[in-house]
Swiss-Prot record:
Substrate binds at residues 9-11, 146, 181, 202-203. Gene3D superfamilies: Aldolase class I. It is found in: Cytoplasm. It comes from Pyrobaculum aerophilum (strain ATCC 51768 / DSM 7523 / JCM 9630 / CIP 104966 / NBRC 100827 / IM2). Keywords: Cytoplasm, Gluconeogenesis, Glycolysis, Isomerase. It is an enzyme of class 5 (isomerase). The keyword Cytoplasm applies. The keyword Isomerase applies. This is Triosephosphate isomerase. The gene is tpiA.
Length: 227
């Protein structure tokens, strides 16, 4: 997993379903190539294989079930995600929370499969517990700010700083990224200045009238180098 990184979560937005998911992913890929920055996209499971076949940038799954491949109707195993072409996995988003033992199992399976692992956490202490599982990154996201347009880097900078310091002190090999309410390039720049190594966001890019222009704006701070 390369840093700094911008991860775009498509969630289950209509704007990112079907061929629209490919359109947004290609816009992200175009920006990544033009600016020379790291961008990953996380489409819905239904679009995962389609997007992975359509772009060269990293494609992450939004989550996975703890079941192994087999007779588990409606479940999605880590192996299924790998076979679909994903290169990474997001775990424990506040909209898809998991128990700690589930996160541990999924992290181990995903890493064994060669997938990047990003574990979401709501606060510094939970981020520390997540970092102890040795993911590639933890994403601190106060749930009350998600989707509000109130960027964590502006409205709760102390949460970001404490997480960066806490995880960095105990698990320096685990990167800290952040998200929740990120809407602009200015928000991304502020997050990087707080010591994070990237940003996880969704609606700002997915629901934009022109995804390419919006992703370009959001990614420019990554191209500027260390703050």
């Amino acid at each position: 997993m390369k840093f700094p990184i911008l991860i775009i979560n498509f969630k289950a937005y209509y704007e990112a379903s079907g061929r629209r998911a490919v359109h947004i992913a290609k816009a992200a890929e175009r920006v990544a190539k033009e600016l020379g920055v790291n961008i990953a996209v996380a489409p819905n499971h239904l679009e995962l294989a389609l997007v992975a076949q359509s772009v060269e940038i990293p494609v992450y799954a939004q989550g996975a079930d703890v079941e192994s491949p087999g007779a588990h109707t409606a479940h999605v195993a880590v192996d299924n995600i790998k076979e679909a072409g994903a290169s990474g996995l997001i775990l424990n988003h506040s909209e898809a929370p998991l128990r700690l033992n589930e996160i541990a199992k999924l992290t181990a399976r995903a890493k064994a499969a060669g997938l990047d692992v990003v574990i979401c956490a709501p606060d510094p202490r939970t981020s520390l517990a997540a970092a102890a599982l040795s993911p590639h990154a933890v994403a601190v996201e106060p749930p009350e700010l998600i989707g509000t347009g109130r960027a964590v880097s502006k409205y709760k900078p102390e949460t970001v700083v404490e997480t960066v310091q806490l995880v960095g002190r105990h698990f320096p090999d685990v990167a800290v990224i952040t998200g929740a309410g990120i809407e602009s390039g200015e928000d991304v720049e502020a997050a990087l200045k707080l010591g994070t190594r990237g940003v996880l966001l969704a609606s700002a890019a997915v629901k934009a009238k022109d995804p390419y222009l919006k992703i370009l704006e959001l990614a420019k701070p990554l191209a500027a180098g260390p703050p």
